[in-house]
């Protein structure tokens, strides 16, 4: 669709990808990276605009999986620097998420304590900065 729009002269310079995913079902990070690359080859800028990773019954093991999913999604963006120019979570704390506290989708819990996902995102960014 975007390729066709560009071919018809539609003035489009970028696309936002919503990433509302779950620890029980998330996209392959290599497929996400490939999609970002493909969009870049069309001359489009990409932004991941709404990242959250639902985690119902989020015990320690599931929080670690949630952290891994966040890290892989962010890495897919960072691996396409110059194309993927933004990575945003769809909120800050599980207390105020549009999905409800019970699915704990964000980087901070309902008490604003940092979750493993926060530290994974930080580590991924720090590794890129090295």
Please report, for each region that a protein language model flagged, where it lies by residue.
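Active-site cradle of extracellular carbohydrate-active enzymes
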Residues: 1-10, 16
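Aromatic-rich peripheral "rim/lid" segments of glycoside hydrolase catalytic domains that contact
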Residues: 4-7, 27-130
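Short, conserved beta-strand edge motifs with alternating hydrophobic and charged residues
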Residues: 14-18, 47-50
